[in-house]
Amino acid sequence: MSKALTIGQVAATSGVSTHTLRYYEQAGLLRSIGRTDAGHRLYAPGDLDWLQFVMRLKATGMPIAGMQAFAALRAEGDATFGARRAMLIEHRDAVLARIAELQTNLDAISDKIAFYEAAEREASTG
């Protein structure tokens, strides 16, 4: 994709509402969004890549404040690579802990399903 997209096209492509796109821009998560002479937003391919990453952070539970801090570091340039890496390591560790917790809960649910299956088999053979 080499040409800029309107906010409606980005919403349709990304599944993110136009309201959310405007909010993300206002919150500082999407910066330097281009504008037409009439003031309509124009998103570059790099903006869509960044939006996808922001949505991954959101989907994995990073709070808006964390995403804002990461976006602010990103806006400062390459000198913040270390700080951004540290933030992502911390977030990854939190995601891994959540996955482990979910796996433990899933295992307990699977055990209960197996219990009921065995109980039903035993009851039917009587």
Model-derived regions, located:
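Basic helix-turn-helix/winged-helix DNA-binding cores
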Residues: M1-A69
